[in-house]
Amino acid sequence: CGCVVAATGSAAGITYLMGGNYEEITYAIKNMIANISGMICDGAKPGCALKVTSGVSTAIFSAYLAMQHSYADSTEGIVEDDIDRTIRNLTRIGHDGMQVTDDLILDIMTHKQ
């Protein structure tokens, strides 16, 4: 879901606007990736507004946690100590992992009763 990527950028920006430094911004990004990276896209529709709401509220929450130096560490799923590797892990899921998922979602949507 594109909301995950957009909201992660928002979390970084919110943290910066709150006076956060580079380290705290990486904390916010890690919080976002640990929290909503599993959100899937199931087609553009009114339900997307719900996902945007989840992304925005999670971005704000992640920024607040980051400013308190509370963040998901490398014991949490796809999060690694290095922020670049963490982002690459999310990218791998979006690029490689979602190909089969997209086909499955489309199959479910086209075979509803």
Q: What are the roles of these predicted feature ranges?
A:
Residues 7, 14-113:
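Functionally critical mobile loop/hinge segments
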